[in-house]
Amino acid sequence: MSLKYGEIIKQMSLEEKALMMSGKNTWETVDFEKYGIPSMAMSDGPHGLRRQAGAGDHLGLNASLPATCFPTAATIANSWDEKLGEEIGTALAEEAVTMDVNVILGPGLNIKRSPLCGRNFEYFSEDPYHAGKMAAAYVKGIQSKGISACPKHFAANSQELRRMASDSVVDERTFREIYTTGFEIAVKEGKSKSIMSSYNEVNGVYANENRHMLQEILVDEWGFDGYVVSDWGGSNDHALGVMNGSHLEMPGTGKSGMRDIVRAVKDGTLPEEVLDQRLDELLNVVFATHQATVDGKGKKFDVEGHHALARKAAEESVVLLKNSNNILPLKPGTKVAVIGDFAKTPRYQGAGSSLVNPTKQPESILDVIGDSGLVMTAYEQGYIRNRKPNAALAKSAVEAAKNADVVLVFAGLDEISESEGLDRTHMHMPQAQNELIDAITAVNTNVVVVLSAGSSIEMPWFDYVKGIVHGYLGGQAGASAMMNVLTGKVCPSGKLNETYPLHYEDTPAFHYYPSKERSSEYREALYVGYRYYTTVGKKVRFPFGYGLSYTTFAYSNLSVDKDGVTFTIKNTGDVEGTEIAQLYVGKQSETIFRPVRELKGFARVTLAPGEEKSVHIAFDDKTFRFYDTRTNTWEVESGNYQIMVGTDADTMVLVGSLDVAGTVAEGGYSKEILPEYFSGKIENVDDIEYRELYGREIPDGSWSGEIQMNDAVCQLYYGKGIFGKLFYGVLRILLKISEWQGKPNLNVLFNYNMPIRGYAKMTGGFVTMEMARALTEMANGHRIKGTAHLIRAAVKRD
């Protein structure tokens, strides 16, 4: 295979080539001035750059340069606006080049398997098509300025608990249809130059060294020609990763990674021509993105313009969930009581590696209400974040509520509820907030709850309030965007990217999530989110794709042909509004189990009062396909398909059908062997049926009784060594302190979920792999042997 940069590579020594495959430091690749190879800088940035000014660290403990804090991915996904996603991506890139950033580590598009995942605020959707389309838009925007996007985390990375020591056990059809389709769209349509592998194993093999994922799917099938980077500290066997399709381990590991590669080349397990090919692919992106940052040096980005874009993005993404008696929009002069700590101190972004230092002080409702035309009769805090109910604060809030025309209660999830490194344990809002809403509705019937949260929540007070408006995490301009919606300056058009179940116990993965042992079994298979609820007919609070407007829309004139669907939408209300029409496809089959319907397209249409438009949604290569594990390829089953246009996943307003000549006459599944999967009732799939679906023996993920290098630090509690138990105990105390303070301790969370070998990957070579092995021995109670091993390894370290 010819190499684009073969002339450079052939001049390099084996050690120099090997050194290039690990980072120079936390954020940059190795540079070689004598070969003209520049360093390539990476930065977190799914919804805003986190370029650190001083010494870099993965968790953002050191301050980052000011950057626009856009709404998070979960927020923007509610807009269903690909053009908006591309605009945000372009703005992110414009900021990146002024900060000498070549690669933006985002967007994140893991599937929202469960509402409890702590990073759901960073991810687009529970649906892979929706997630993929939004991600591709971001990628196009970012790469339009000559730098690289880096979709993450590839793949089946659905929980934060023990995320670096977890094995996602998932059948191949589910893996392809649900957990990789979004990445496929981002790669094929967005032309992403890089991909970040996930921390977890997939069917027993770490993602960063999984040949099936990185070579057979990513390169051979999708045509990916960029580079793969490990998640920070996520490289397990560096040489095996390079052999199987990975390129770059981050952060830098000193000379440890270089020695691993050199050793593998010399012992024949990594052919040097494979190393050369990986280096060539990496250099292609290094050189391709270099000029953009050279051109951007010394330039400034449009702070005001990007702030305005952040507001526009938040406005398009607000979801109106309830509007009884048209309590909204609020008319000028309405006397409102503003209740809730979130009105004064907004929660506008999530916590973790995506934390942004905004260019402007984030707006609060109290900052913007003065220009709204409303009359604020009182503001009361009502509750203390992450604390038990406060009777005095609640009493003052209730008194204020008595004298208002409308009460605006600002509520949601606090900082400790959603963060990288932890998962929620329930779907409740804090007790203090729920009790406060109950008390206020007892004295005033005109209550509107304004929510801030990055994932779905339970709403026990739903029947007692007249309005519910959800802003998700709206970024630095989220408050003015929300006020514009509340007062009718903006007509709400957002629709939910995820289902809101009535109770967490109703969710399809309830019995399987999160995994406490190493194996995380995806027994619910295809039935994620609305695919489950619609198939079994389970009632939900709000379906996927749901959202109200201040106007109304009528659908008519459905036409279906081989190319797609055409229909008419009319604005039948009194104000201009935007509707998001959704295309769903379903098929009954005796030999292939399927959800009753799946999203296959969508259109965002803006209409003036009385205006109507003809809308066309085209079919594509994903409309009718399923992954056939008999042929290990995508197939289309012949037969009659139901073609549906809906306002959300539950409400189909136009229904047609189409006969499709497929590639196979039937599937290879049996109702007798897989009865639960054909019915969709997958709440308690037994081992026999799951083994049939999985196609192999289900791995035993239970702990072996001995601490291993790839066991998480949180498992040291079970070890025999006193030092390991003490370290675990200290971490637990620190976690409790952070919970009490109401802010996640990212450093502690990272350590808590990290495997022991992670210390050899995250300390820049200070801890070697041999030292990590010695620590493992000590954790198993071999104190003398382990200490001696540790000393020897430390002496040999260079």
Q: Over which residues does each language-model region extend?
A:
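N-terminal, non-catalytic alpha-helical interaction modules of very large eukaryotic scaffold proteins
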Residues: 727-730, 734, 738, 742-745
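Enrichment for repetitive, rod-forming helical segments
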Residues: 24, 159, 688, 698-699, ...
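Terminal connector regions
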Residues: 621-668
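Glycoside hydrolase catalytic-domain context in secreted enzymes
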Residues: 1-622, 640-644, 649, 738, ...
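Charged, amphipathic alpha-helical linkers/stalks
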Residues: 656-725
